[in-house]
A protein has these predicted regions:
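A glycine-rich (often HGG/GG-containing) alpha/beta subdomain
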Residues: 1-150, 154, 158, 333
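C-terminal-of-GTPase-core extension/linker across diverse P-loop GTPases
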Residues: 2-11, 15, 58, 146-267, ...
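Short beta->alpha junction loops/turns
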Residues: 26-27, 95, 255, 312-313, ...
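Switch I (G2) and immediately adjacent beta-strands of P-loop GTPase domains
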Residues: 54-77, 256-284, 299-305
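Conserved beta-strand segments of alpha/beta enzyme cores
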Residues: 112, 272-274, 355
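Short glycine-/small-residue-rich Rossmann-like dinucleotide-binding loops
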Residues: 244, 279-280, 304, 311-312, ...
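Generic enzyme active-site microenvironment
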Residues: 275, 309, 335
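Inter-motif core of Ras-like GTPase G domains
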Residues: 289-313
Length: 458
């Protein structure tokens, strides 16, 4: 059980050696604890510092009085802080030993180590942010593309919350009308039912759009599993290294160099690709290489996108034809590489339904067009999230689906003329599911699941 009345502390910068580390204290005794082990030349106490101020001085070992480090301490007094509590943030030199020593001092003075996500959990419990905004913090930290960053920022700024609150306001009005007729059955219900049904149908349409957006933008959120395939020495590893921006695969003129599948995450025109580079296909008696080819076939089957690389300077081979056949029905882009040495295969690909891009990868020719074609193949002509309300969280999507189910149950109960109390029960269920998204309706179990995804220090 997390004890919110206690003062907590944690290192909030990444572990390891760096220029600066930051240790955060939050709670009613945060400034008092920091003040007891902080000294500045003027002798003034941190308790007297103005909120949102930075104080220069030294942190002392409370057991010996020895100076531990030269620091800056940021003071934020409740409610004007991330947690809406008194907060002291100590910026010290970035070594794991010294930050550990300072953390030990704070614990000795009465703070306890924070649980994962506990600072953000307190921000939620103290009303600074709702649960959807709290989850946006994780999205912001984990974003890998511009689209992911923007969607997380909009969620943090309340775009999801505002939409959910609009839905709840409309359905709350519908429920209030329905409950009025439970209390006063002699009233004429027909006019009110027309309004209630209109609100419910409108809410279902809005929920459908939100759920559709979740699936439409799944590639931007989770990335697309992508297999780079082709016969040996056609430029697969060069393409992999180009997309990743680093040398993850050995590039040599010798066939058969890449014998294993190489994982990597690439940002291609704002679309994250989870890339698999595979062993090239050719006739071989090498058992190790044969295993690589077998795994290539497996990666084709499990991938969502195939980048099929063909050597444009040579006629199509039986292995090229084999891969073209093997990838039929898959979402794919055909890359005709080495066109700086000639292009004798493009006409032979004219019947392919997949887009064909001509490149000279090592020379950098055709790469911008390739990036655009890859994105268009996966996401169509979508230009981006463009300010629309996007559901990016599986928990939110599940809650929306449950809310929609309850609304459909209400319409069925209404059609079957079931008692008003049962109809109202379904409307309340829809409202509760929406409330779980923002935390208006929540349980300790939901909070534990949400904040277990956070790291210590956030």
């Amino acid at each position: 059980m997390i004890r919110q009345e206690e003062t907590i502390c944690a290192i909030i910068t990444p572990p390891g050696t760096g220029g600066v580390s930051v240790i955060r204290l939050s709670g009613k005794d945060a400034i008092s604890i920091a003040s007891r082990v902080f000294r500045k030349k003027s002798g003034k106490s941190l308790r007297d510092a103005k909120t949102n101020s930075i104080q220069y001085g030294h942190i002392l070992d409370s057991s010996t009085g020895a100076v531990l480090d030269e620091v800056l301490v940021g003071i934020m007094k409740a409610p004007h802080s991330y947690t809406c509590e008194d907060v002291a943030e100590v910026s010290c030199h970035g070594g794991p030993f010294i930050t550990g020593r300072i953390l030990e001092v704070f614990v000795r003075e009465g703070a306890r180590l924070a649980e994962p996500g506990e600072f953000t959990r307190r921000a939620f419990l103290n009303g600074r942010i709702d649960l959807a905004q709290a989850e946006a913090v994780i999205g912001l930290i984990n974003s890998k593309t511009e689209e992911g960053l923007r969607s997380a920022i909009w969620q943090l700024e309340g775009s999801i919350s505002r939409k959910i609150n609009e839905l709840r306001d409309s359905l709350t009005a519908a429920l209030a009308s329905l409950e009025a007729f439970i209390d006063f059955p002699e009233e004429d219900i027909d006019v009110a039912i027309h309004d209630i049904k209109g609100r419910v149908h409108s809410s279902i349409e809005s929920i459908d759009r939100l759920i559709e957006g979740y699936y439409r933008w799944r590639p931007f959120r989770e990335g697309i599993v992508t297999a780079i395939v082709g016969r040996t020495n056609v430029g697969k590893s060069s393409l992999l290294n180009l997309l990743l921006g680093e040398e993850r695969a050995i590039v040599t003129p010798h066939p058969g160099t890449t014998r294993d599948i190489v994982d990597g995450l690439a940002n291609v025109a704002g679309l994250p690709l989870r890339i698999l580079d595979t062993a090239g296909l050719r006739a071989t008696e090498d058992m190790v290489e044969e295993e690589g080819i077998r795994r290539m076939y497996k990666s084709i089957d499990s991938s969502e996108l195939v980048l099929l690389v063909i050597d444009g300077s040579e006629p199509l081979t039986e292995w090229d034809e084999e891969l073209l056949k093997r990838t039929e029905g898959k979402k794919k882009v055909i890359i005709v590489n080495k066109i700086d040495k000639g292009n004798v295969v493009q006409d032979g690909l004219s019947t392919s339904s997949a887009p064909v891009v001509c490149t000279a990868i090592i020379q950098g020719e055709g790469i911008d067009l390739l990036r655009k074609i890859i994105r268009d193949t996966v996401a169509g002509k979508e230009k981006g999230i463009a300010g629309e309300t996007i559901v990016t969280n599986l928990r939110h999507k599940n809650a929306l689906e449950h809310s929609k189910m309850e609304l459909n149950n209400f319409l069925e109960a209404l059609h079957n003329k079931l008692p008003l109390e049962i109809q109202a029960l379904h409307l309340r269920g829809a409202l509760d599911s929406l409330g779980e998204i923002t935390g208006i309706v929540t349980t300790e179990d939901i909070l534990d699941r949400v904040f277990s995804e956070f790291c210590i220090g956030k």
